[in-house]
């Protein structure tokens, strides 16, 4: 399996046994100016996250590109 990974945001081969790609998003102190923080990677199972953290998991190659944010205006 290949997934996008941060910080490079380029497709990389996942370690053996990690067949899930994920996109995790959350707000920090700069969220209102910079948008949500994003982490991309591979996992054996879809990661469990805390309240306030978004997670999307998928199981095809390169299915977790960096999210496109709608500009405020």
From Swiss-Prot:
GO cellular component: extracellular region
GO molecular function, one term: toxin activity
Disulphide bridges: 3-21, 14-42, 27-31, 46-57, 58-63
PROSITE patterns reported in the protein's UniProt record: SNAKE_TOXIN
Record's keyword annotation contains Repressor: no
Predominant place of localization: secreted
Residue spans crossing the bilayer: none
Tissue-level expression: Expressed by the venom gland.
Miscellaneous comment in the UniProt entry for this protein: The variant I sequence is shown.
Reported function: Binds with high affinity to muscular (alpha-1/CHRNA1) and neuronal (alpha-7/CHRNA7) nicotinic acetylcholine receptor (nAChR) and inhibits acetylcholine from binding to the receptor, thereby impairing neuromuscular and neuronal transmission.
Family per record: Belongs to the three-finger toxin family. Long-chain subfamily. Type II alpha-neurotoxin sub-subfamily.
Protein name, entry field: Alpha-elapitoxin-Dv2a
Organism: Dendroaspis viridis (Western green mamba)
């Amino acid at each position: 399996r290949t997934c996008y990974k941060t910080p490079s945001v380029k497709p990389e081969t996942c370690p053996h046994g990690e067949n899930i790609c994920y996109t995790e998003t959350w707000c920090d102190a700069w969220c209102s100016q910079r948008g949500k923080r994003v982490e991309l990677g591979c996992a054996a199972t879809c990661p469990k996250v805390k309240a306030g953290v978004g997670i999307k998991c998928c199981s095809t190659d390169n299915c977790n590109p960096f999210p496109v944010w709608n500009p405020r205006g």
